[in-house]
A protein has these predicted regions:
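A short glycine-rich, Lys/Arg-flanked "PGG" loop and its adjoining helix->strand segment in the class I
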Residues: 113-125
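Conserved alpha-helix/loop element of class I SAM-dependent methyltransferases that forms part
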Residues: 20-37, 49
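Class I SAM-dependent methyltransferase SAM/SAH-binding core
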Residues: 41-90
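C-terminal lobe and adjacent flexible extensions of AdoMet/dcAdoMet transferase-like proteins
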Residues: 191-195
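Class I SAM-dependent methyltransferase Rossmann-like catalytic core
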Residues: 1-23
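C-terminal alpha-helical "lid/dimerization" subdomain adjacent to the S-adenosyl-L-methionine
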Residues: 132-174, 180-184
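A conserved beta-strand element that flanks and buttresses the S-adenosyl-L-methionine
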Residues: 99
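A short His-aromatic
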Residues: 105-107, 111
């Protein structure tokens, strides 16, 4: 499998913190205090750095397409009870919580439709999805930054999107409802719980 993040893995978290401070970390983790004793699925969790403070509560799977990122995640989350998996996820098990940390903007809309139907089928009764991602920009600076980020990931990591998906449309299309939301940068960065 080609490792599109090989060059990004060593600098991903430091670069993120340099540009956004602690805001992406906060978005990724703001709802995690509610998941003890839950079976979780983390899809595209990168180097796992954000989840280190919660690893005692993490049981389930951590799925990542990049071998470089997965290797870092295994080290960063060595005390968790997560099973680390490289490659596309097969959605054969059921989970209480599915985490989607800044990953959905790597899919085109057709793939998102398929992906979301599988997400819904992978949730236990009463299960929830926690999304953290960028949303439509609120000013020209954010617009310029998101275009730069998207272009950079297209060039360096082979992402296919040229814009941000309409996440809420896809959640609603599978009958899910947003039950909680936290925002940063006037709503440009959001964390949401969907059930």
């Amino acid at each position: 499998m080609k490792d599109n993040y090989r060059w990004l893995a060593p600098v991903y978290t430091p670069l993120s913190r340099m540009v956004f401070g602690n805001q992406l970390h906060e978005a990724n983790t703001c709802f995690l205090s509610n998941i003890p004793n839950k079976k979780v699925l983390i899809l595209g969790g990168g180097d796992g750095w954000d989840y280190r403070g919660f690893q005692d509560n993490l049981t389930g799977k951590f799925v990542e397409l990049s071998p470089s990122m997965l290797s870092k995640a295994e080290k960063n989350l060595k005390d968790s009870k997560l099973h680390f998996v490289i490659g596309p996820f097969d959605f054969k098990e059921k989970y209480d919580v599915i985490l989607l940390p800044f990953v959905l903007d790597t899919f085109n809309d057709q793939d998102l439709e398929i992906f979301f139907s599988k997400v819904k089928d992978s949730l236990n009764s009463g299960g929830k999805v926690i999304l953290a991602d960028f949303f439509p920009s609120q000013n020209w600076r954010q617009e310029l930054m998101i275009k730069t980020i998207i272009s950079g990931f297209r060039m360096l990591a082979g992402h296919v999107r040229q814009d941000l998906p309409d996440y809420e449309y896809f959640f609603r299309s599978i009958g899910m409802e947003k039950v909680e939301e936290k925002i940063w940068k006037k709503g440009w960065i959001k964390a949401q719980i969907w059930k």
